Design a protein with these regions (language model features):
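An N-terminally biased module of ancient metal coordination in phosphate/nucleic-acid-related enzymes
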Residues: 1-13, 114-171
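A metal-dependent hydrolase metal-coordination microenvironment
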Residues: 1-72, 76, 80, 165-171
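Alpha-helical context
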Residues: 16, 20-27, 32, 57, ...
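Alpha-helix capping and helix-coil boundary motifs
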Residues: 39, 99-102, 155-156
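Residue-level marker of positions within ordered structural domains that often coincide
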Residues: 56, 86, 149
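Residue-level "edge-of-site" marker
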Residues: 64, 94, 150
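Conserved acidic, metal-coordinating active-site core of Asp-based
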Residues: 71-145
């Protein structure tokens, strides 16, 4: 099944919406990706600065070795830090190491703990609205489905019905 995961916002909450059954050859998806990529490139160096303010001294080169396009994700920061021998005993990284409370999926957990809205290394990217993404997906033959609501809607599940009214078709 052709599909895509797209970042968007609803009521200032960043969400991930899956578009199942889309026409992935439609240029609208590439254009959206290019627009977001430009913003992500600009945010990557800010993320590096914010990460280093937590008591690290990561270098751009360490992240460039993990990134194919110059965008640094929270997962990449987690990977670079956990592999950096200087930080074997760093207190902030202990939960992500073997046997730690966040070690089941350390890179992704590092992302969720430090790089999403409200966390210390979050950098804002202006994403399209939920309504726009639902329309984009539907107009190109797809079905719009909300991804991992437990992470994005923590404590705000009351807005889910509104999102369905906007055209969301699944979870």
């Amino acid at each position: 099944i052709p599909a895509i995961e797209i970042d968007c916002t609803y009521k200032e909450i960043n969400l991930h919406v899956l578009g199942y059954g889309i026409d992935y050859t439609n240029p609208a998806f590439n254009q959206l990706g290019e627009d977001i990529l430009k913003q992500e490139l600009n945010c990557s160096l800010k993320k590096l600065e914010l990460t280093n303010q937590l008591g690290f001294d990561l270098k751009k080169e360490q992240l460039d070795a993990l990134s194919s396009n110059g965008v640094y994700t929270g997962e990449m920061f987690g990977e670079a830090l956990l592999k950096d021998e200087r930080y074997v005993d760093h207190e902030l990284l202990k939960p992500y190491r073997s046997g730690g409370s966040r070690s089941d999926n350390p890179y992704v957990n590092f992302y969720w703990d430090y790089y999403v809205q409200g966390k210390p290394c979050y950098t804002e990217v202006i994403f399209p609205s939920l309504e726009k993404i639902i329309q984009l997906i539907n107009d190109r033959g797809g079905v719009a489905v909300l991804a991992h609501p437990g992470n994005n809607l923590k404590g705000k599940f009351d807005i889910f019905d509104e999102m369905v009214e906007k055209g969301l078709q699944g979870v």
